[in-house]
A protein has these predicted regions:
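Gram-negative outer-membrane beta-barrel domains
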Residues: 2-276
């Protein structure tokens, strides 16, 4: 929420400054092409995320992995992030953001001061989202998602104030995502049951302001919130010592999955646009 308020304040300040110029509405009808560059990061709403287990392989998660004495093998807990340490005391690194850059093209129609349009966008990004479980052996087990790129189809509606156009935007998003698993456990075998690379979808919502510096060229600032629905990534633990925690219920092993299928991203971008 703090991030959204800061972005809204910046966009609002630019809009207010332009409105103060009391310019007449310019002509925004037509096609355009442009580029964007900015920064994206994981929304801080998954702090309670953990890894869940299916010990009897019936497709239902929430089972407790038990040691030979009946104790919870994962009593050490979980952390939101990635670690290379086998114990939780070693700490976890937070989720990582990264630069974003891409291209867009679209078309606007102007009706008085109201401007409505559609656009398509392709953006390269680098945002990572991890969760780690710790067993008492000790060992760490990390499930990670890497967002590599976004395709989006959005509508936008704005109110032209001379050469300045504040607007809201929203639409559909597709994402190129890599999913991976790593562990410090060398006693068992870990197999990816789900595909590691996939396209997933979701939606985007945001706001921005665009200002014409010439009749054809404009610069802009934009905030976007993206929510993606990852339908689950499963890893199976098998092998190891006879009667071990992962094979004591079902000899074929135990499945791992993460509790949160949502991948939520904040993005702040600058845009440069050429209008035909």
């Amino acid at each position: 929420m703090k991030t959204m308020l800061c972005a809204a304040a910046a966009i609002g300040a630019l809009t207010a400054a332009s409105a103060a110029q009391a310019q007449t509405a310019g002509d925004w009808t037509g096609a355009y092409i442009g580029g964007v560059a900015g920064y994206g990061w994981q929304a801080e709403n998954d702090g309670d995320e953990s890894i869940v287990f299916d010990t009897n392989l019936d497709g239902t998660y929430g089972d407790t992995v038990r040691t030979g004495t009946g104790a919870d093998a994962f009593a050490a807990g979980f952390c939101d992030g990635q670690t290379f340490n086998p114990t939780r005391a070693g700490g976890c690194g937070g989720d990582e953001g990264g630069p974003e850059f891409g291209v867009r093209m679209g078309y606007d129609w102007q009706f008085g001061n109201i401007v409505a349009g559609v656009l398509g966008e392709a953006v390269r990004t680098d945002v990572k989202d991890s969760v780690t479980a710790f067993s008492g052996t000790p060992a760490a087990y990390t499930m990670r998602r890497d967002l590599n790129g976004l395709l989006a189809a959005r509508a936008r509606v704005g109110y032209a104030v001379g050469n300045t156009l504040p607007y809201v935007t929203g639409g559909y998003a597709w994402a190129d995502m890599d999913r991976s698993f790593s562990t410090t456990n060398t006693a068992n075998t870990f197999t990816q049951v789900s595909e590691s690379k996939k396209w997933t979808d979701g939606w985007q919502l945001g706001a921005g302001v665009e200002h014409k510096i010439t009749n054809d060229v404009s610069l802009g600032l934009e905030y976007l919130y993206t929510r993606l629905d990852d339908d689950g990534y499963t890893v199976r633990a098998s092998g190891g010592p006879a009667g071990g925690p992962f094979t004591s219920v079902n000899g074929a092993g135990t499945d791992f999955n993460r509790t949160n299928d949502e991948f939520n991203i904040h993005s702040v971008r600058m845009a440069a646009t050429y209008r035909f």
